[in-house]
Amino acid sequence: MKISFDAIGEKYVTFLAGSGAAKGQVCKVSANDTVSGCAAGEAFCGVVAEVRDGCAAVVMGGYAEVPFSDETDPSAGYATLAADGDGGVKSVTSGGRSCLIVHVDAAAKTLGLFL
């Protein structure tokens, strides 16, 4: 039996899509009603699920999958993560946000986590 966390507790919010808002990448609120891509080290508000017609659907809570750029693979459990500047996340010791990592795919460099 395969374990799936897809759609558990997902909370989507629609924003205007600003610069750098791209599907599958972390984002930040950059202006009124608008999300944009994050610079390295910035805290992120969610993960862009879709961009269409100038709007972005953002997963703000629940399960999401994101790329990671740590040289050492993160471990399952709670971790403090921030944007890596390339649409993914990296582990940080200060700043960022706490997330529950439930799956690490070292080969694909992706994390399954709860926001």
Segments predicted by a language model, with ranges:
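Surface-exposed, low-hydrophobicity beta-strand/loop segments enriched in small/polar/acidic residues
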Residues: 1-115
